[in-house]
C-alpha cells in the first residue's frame, strides 16, 4: 500500500545547505528548496547537475547563464534547467526563489559542490 503520509515543513526551521539554500519538503522523487534574500554577486563557476530543476522567482532579479545563453529572471518568472546542462546564476539584486529538483538534490550530497 502506498505511503499517504503528509508532511508539513516550516521554512523557519529548515536545514540550510552549504550554498545557502533552505531545504523544504522532499518526497521520493522530488524536493523543494528556497533561496532567500540571496545578495548580488558575480557568478560562481558553471556546473552541471545530476537532476532537473524548475524554479520560480518571488523577489529580485538574477541572470541564469546556461549553455551559452543569458536569461534574465524577474518576479513572476519560472525556468527549467535540464539535467546535465552547464549553468550558473548571477544575482543582480536581493533575490528570493523557490526551486524543485527531480530527483531530490540534497540526496547523497548532489547539491553541495
Regions found by a protein language model. Name each.
Residues 28, 65-69, 92:
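Short strand-coil-strand connectors
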Residues 37, 49-64:
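Short, conserved beta-strand element in jelly-roll/cupin
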Residues 107-113:
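Acidic/histidine-enriched, glycine/proline-rich intrinsically disordered or flexible terminal extensions
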Residues 42-44, 79, 83-88:
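Histidine-centered metal-chelating micro-motifs
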Residues 83-107:
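Ligand-binding loop in jelly-roll beta-barrel domains
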Amino acid at each position: 500500500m502506498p505511503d499517504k503520509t503528509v508532511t508539513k515543513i516550516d521554512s523557519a526551521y529548515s536545514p540550510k545547505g552549504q550554498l545557502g539554500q533552505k531545504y523544504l519538503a522532499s518526497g521520493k522523487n522530488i524536493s523543494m528548496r528556497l533561496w532567500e534574500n540571496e545578495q548580488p554577486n558575480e557568478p560562481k563557476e558553471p556546473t552541471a547537475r545530476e537532476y532537473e530543476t524548475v524554479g520560480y522567482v518571488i523577489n529580485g532579479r538574477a541572470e541564469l547563464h546556461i549553455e551559452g545563453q543569458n536569461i534574465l529572471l524577474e518576479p513572476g518568472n519560472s525556468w527549467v534547467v535540464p539535467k546535465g546542462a552547464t549553468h550558473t546564476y548571477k544575482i543582480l539584486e536581493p533575490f528570493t526563489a523557490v526551486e524543485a529538483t527531480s530527483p531530490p538534490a540534497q540526496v547523497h550530497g548532489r547539491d553541495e559542490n
